[in-house]
């Protein structure tokens, strides 16, 4: 089963790394064989540390050039999936803050 997560983010990169690990654990438990992240960076003012592998799963980061807000960032992520990723079974939308469990 292929599951794609849309995750809008604004500056909270540390929480996103934790969420990525939680998604990885959940994917093993649920036996999802293909999991991807579409991370929509809503013009964060803090840079992502790219010196190490930031996420436990394959991911695409969409960098917006201006802050669009949470809902618009989600919409952009969904549009990206519709245009670029055609072979998925489910799309799950999660905020990066870790309040929701994967």
Q: Whereabouts are the PLM-identified features?
A:
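Hydrophobic targeting segments
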Residues: 2-7, 16, 23, 35-40
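Short, well-formed alpha-helical segments that are part of the catalytic scaffolds
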Residues: 12-28
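Donor nucleotide-sugar binding loop of glycosyltransferases
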Residues: 12-16, 44, 101
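Short helix-capping segments at alpha-helix termini
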Residues: 27-32, 54-58, 85
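Conserved donor nucleotide-binding strand/loop of the catalytic core
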Residues: 52-80
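Short beta-strand-to-loop acidic/aromatic patch adjacent to the donor-nucleotide binding site
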Residues: 85-99
């Amino acid at each position: 089963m292929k599951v794609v997560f849309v995750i809008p983010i604004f500056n909270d990169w540390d929480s996103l790394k934790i969420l990525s690990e939680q998604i990885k654990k959940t994917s093993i438990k649920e036996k999802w064989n293909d999991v991807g992240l579409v991370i929509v960076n809503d013009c964060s003012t803090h840079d992502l540390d790219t010196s190490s592998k930031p996420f436990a799963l394959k991911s695409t980061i969409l960098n917006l050039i201006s802050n669009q807000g949470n809902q618009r960032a989600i919409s952009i992520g969904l549009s990206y999936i519709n245009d670029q990723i055609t072979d998925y079974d489910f799309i799950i939308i999660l905020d990066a803050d870790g309040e929701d469990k994967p």
